Structure formats: C-alpha cells, structure tokens
Amino acid sequence: MKRNTICCIYNSGPHYRWPIFKALADNLDIDFCFGSNTVYTKSIKTFDYGKLPGFTRLLRNRRIFGKFYWQSGALRQLLKPYRQYLMLGEAYCLSSWIIAFAAKLLHRKTVCWTHGWYGRESGIKRIISKRFYSMFSEILTYNDYSGNLLAEGGIPRSKIHTIGNSLDSRKHRAMRSELRSTDIYSSHFGNTDPVLLYCGRVQQSKRLDLMIEAAHILQEHGTNVNLVFVGADNEHVGLEDMARRVGLQNKVWLFGPCYDDNKLAELFYNATVCVSPGNVGLTAVHALSFGCPVITHNNFPFQGPEFECVRPGLTGDFFRQNDAADLARVIAKWLGHTARQREETAKAAYAEIDGKWNVDSQISVFKSVLKQKN
C-alpha cells in the first residue's frame, strides 16, 4: 500500500471547508490531522473527519495562556516518514513552532497556510510572527494584499504564494444555470423595493446598525429599501429595536440562520446588493458566486482577506469605515442599475470567483507548491 508523503496539520475542519480538504485528499498523497475544535470558538460546526480520505489523527487543542495553545499529538507526526508538512500558519500554536523547526533540521519541507499579516500588527507581534513565518519553506496567503505585506516586511517574495479562499465552488458554479428571479422578497415585504442583504453571523462587530442607519438616510431622501439579515443572532444585537427606533420595522426581515444552498442562492441572486458593514470574509465569495455585488468598508487592515474579490464598480464597492452616510451614498449608486448593468455585474462576479476564489485554482497552487502533478 502506497504511503502518503504529505501531512496536513490543522486546528479544526469547519464544515464549510469540506470541499477544499476533500479536493486535497483527491489530488495529493496526503494525510490529515485535525483538532476537535478551535481554541477561540467551539461553536463552529466541523465536518465528519472520518469521511475524509487520509484522516489519521484527532488532535487536542489545549490552551496554554492567552491566545497561545498546543496541539497534543501533533509532534508525533515528526516520527513518521513524511516529506512535507502543510500546516495552519498560526504563530499562537506553540507546537507548530517545534514542528517547523524540527522539520528544517530533518530536511523536510514545510508549507504555511495562513492569513499572514493584516497591516495592523503591533511591533512585537510583527517580530514574533516574522520569525515564525521565516521557518517555513513556503507560505500560502489568502490574498495578494497579505503576501505583499509579508514581502515588504522582509519575507522572501519567492516563498510567498497566493492561495485564495473558497466555498463549494464546483457546486455553486453548477447551480448558476438554475438561478431565476423569484418573488421571495416581494411576497414577504409586499413591495418591490430594492433589497439590501446581509448574510453571516449577526454580531456587534459586524456593525449592522450602520446598515439600518444607511437605509434610514436613503428613506429620508426618498429612496425606500428592504433589509434582510440571514444568520444567527447569538449576541442579541437587537436589530428589531434599532429598526423600530427609525421607523423601519416593516422594512426588516430577520431571516435567521440558513444552511440550504438552494435557498441561499435564491436570496443572493434576487438581492440588489450584499452589504457587510463590518469586515467581510467568505460572505463576499458566497455572494459573488451567485452574481450579487458586495459593499463593505475600505479600511483594509481591519478586513478579512476576501475583501480583495470586491472590485470597485465591477463586483461591488467600498465605503468609509463606520460612516453610515457614506454607506448610503455608495448603496445609492447600485440601486439605479439597469437590468443590463446587473447582468454585467453578475458576469464580472462569476469571472472573479472562477478566476481565483475557487477550489480548482487552489488545488493548482497546492500542486505547484507541493510539487505533485498526479
């Protein structure tokens, strides 16, 4: 029986990342070790590790102090004859330091899969993380922005590669031919006003109050919009109360959590624009996958890496962070688009996702970096 030569060590396997891990298993000679949950949040559902070909070990993520943690069982992978290690690039994981250092002594390749730098890191954090990244043979960052920051900070450009990020891109691509305009919003609201959609966790940090305030500003200037919030409100943010205070209680739909891909596709496709007033992450990829433009803030050091798939005027736009009036101004630009313009936006959105933010392009990068062509 052929022995796999690559070991992937990761903190956990969130359910939405099943497509990329399954594609790795299908395309590379790779074993997987996952933690049962993340140190920072235990609320994220993981996929069934037992269904992933190559899954070999369940690790235990043990908090040491602050954000630092240790993955019990990870070091044992050094005793096996792996030639390459694909690892979550998180400097807070102390066991990863040991593995990266030991692998270097053993002349084994290490590949760091990481967010990299955001641009807001403090001096000491920068120094520590730079030392961490320097130990790896290759670095995979989610976007060009982070890779450029690492290169400017002294990490050799030759070892930095952009990997992008993805959801279930193959499935989403196949679903596009079935997308249709429906009455999902008009039947709920009883009107045909434009729809501003938010999809993600309903949290204080997402600044959804700005979305309601922007809608109020638009209304005062004679433009009515409907607001739809898709996601679980575990922090009791109080969106209904916010809407009631400005007289928009009949213009808000708290849809709640939704994990049905067909329903989400319908919601995105029929919305006028997806708005993420706080940082945006994979929501941007999700929205663009179904042709829906994305609006988010312009302070990139406080953004998720997926902000990079927002191309101003093409696939979405940016507004001044924390500025509801500017958010209203940017939203207004998109409300007047003709059917032809919306069609062009959808084409641009699909091109952006199909070019970089998908499983196939990620696998191409993995194969190149890990030097496997099978």
Q: Where are these predicted regions, by residue range?
A:
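Short hydrophobic beta-strand element within catalytic cores of glycosyltransferases
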Residues: 293-302, 317
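A charged, aromatic-enriched C-terminal amphipathic alpha-helix characteristic of glycosyltransferases
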Residues: 336-371
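Donor nucleotide-sugar binding/catalytic pocket of nucleotide-sugar-dependent glycosyltransferases
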Residues: 134-183, 191
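A short, histidine- and acid-enriched strand-loop-helix "catalytic/donor-clamping" loop
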Residues: 108-125, 135-138
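Nucleotide-activated donor-binding/catalytic signature segment of Leloir-type glycosyltransferases, i.e.
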Residues: 230, 237-258
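Conserved donor-binding/catalytic core segment of Leloir-type glycosyltransferases
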Residues: 7, 184-206, 212-215
